[in-house]
Amino acid sequence: MSADFWCSSQRNKWQLSRQSLLEARRKVLLLERKMIQNGLIKDYPNIHYDFNMRIYLHNLLIKLGRRLNIRQVALATAEIYLNRFLTRVSLKEINVYLLVTTCLYVACKIEECPQHIRLIISEARNLWPEYIPHDVTKLAEFEFYLIEEMDSYLFLHHPYKSLIQIRDFLNENSAVFGFTLTDDELQNAWSLVNDSYITDLHLLLPPHIIAVASIYITIVLKKNLSAIRVNSSAVNSNGGPNSMMFNRNPDQNSMHIDDLMILANPSTPGSDLVNNLERTNFHDMKLDEETIKINKFMNFLDHSHINLDEVVEAMQDMINIYVQWNRYNEQGVKKALQVMLLNRQL
């Protein structure tokens, strides 16, 4: 394993451009059509690798991980494995419940918190008895399939480490930059990173960019939440993410999922912040404590030489999660998978 992201297989083999990712998915669709035409698989028009499916698979991983008390880093690794695998294989030719189980099984090995194969099969069967086989060799076979499709590149770098490094760096250099990350801010940023695994960001951008984007949302956009909340009553948040990662107390200093959705809504005042990072003039704001901290954070970004275009790109995708989550239809995805998987058993 490379201790340096820039020399790692994650950077050199599995960091894609948006164009190459689009091309990879186009190839999967072409392969899928050929397999349907040749009678190798059946066509299920309601099965798509869209945001509904991605959120559903994310929730499956979280659910199984909680039953096994898996560390967050292993869950994150499993989700990247899943995303990589689905750039090469169609959903219509696999059992997604077995895929989720296998990704978590392999991730636990790599992240040095291994789970016995019989235990993980047992817990998966408790959750999804109609889809997970008793035979542990099925998981072992899928493990080799998964590793082969990822070209055996399994070690990963995550934004969590970058978050901790930035927090520690700011603590050590507080006299220079004049601010530090509070525990609440770190937790909010950590939560944003957790949810970011639903997106393609971890196939597209370096981990430190995602970490900085999560801090930016937490520190800078928080300044505008009080004003935005005045208009937030018109936003319908039913069906939003059932995430334990966000503080839902009515604390004006806390980040809320509704706030992020409002920021992502182009019709909402203040929602153009993400698209105007470089043009934001914080000096025009009232110089209260939060604004001073924002100015100091922007000064830190200026000195960091971080690619701000990539930070903006990451922020847009991260905030968009919550817009998509608001439209999430779990029952539709669950029913479509049920029809596909149970028909295979007939």
Swiss-Prot record:
Principal place of residence: nucleus
Q: Which keywords does this chain's UniProt record carry?
A: Activator, Cyclin, Nucleus, Repressor, Transcription, Transcription regulation
For molecular function, the Gene Ontology terms on record are: cyclin-dependent protein serine/threonine kinase regulator activity; RNA polymerase II core promoter sequence-specific DNA binding
Name all Cyclin N-terminal domain ranges: 59-158
CDD domains from the xrefs? CYCLIN_CCNC_rpt1 (cd20513), CYCLIN_SpCG1C_ScCTK2-like_rpt2 (cd20546)
Q: Which Gene3D superfamilies match?
A: Cyclin-like (1.10.472.10)
Could you provide one GO biological process annotation from this protein's UniProt record?
positive regulation of transcription by RNA polymerase II
Instruction: State the source organism's domain of life.
Output: Eukaryota
User: In the UniProt record, which is one GO cellular component term?
Assistant: mediator complex
State where the protein is found.
Answer: Nucleus
Subunit structure, interactors included? Component of the SRB8-11 complex, a regulatory module of the Mediator complex.
Q: What does this protein do?
A: Component of the SRB8-11 complex. The SRB8-11 complex is a regulatory module of the Mediator complex which is itself involved in regulation of basal and activated RNA polymerase II-dependent transcription. The SRB8-11 complex may be involved in the transcriptional repression of a subset of genes regulated by Mediator. It may inhibit the association of the Mediator complex with RNA polymerase II to form the holoenzyme complex. The SRB8-11 complex phosphorylates the C-terminal domain (CTD) of the largest subunit of RNA polymerase II.
The text of the family note is:
Belongs to the cyclin family. Cyclin C subfamily.
Return the protein name: RNA polymerase II holoenzyme cyclin-like subunit
Provide the organism lineage as a comma list: Eukaryota, Fungi, Dikarya, Ascomycota, Saccharomycotina
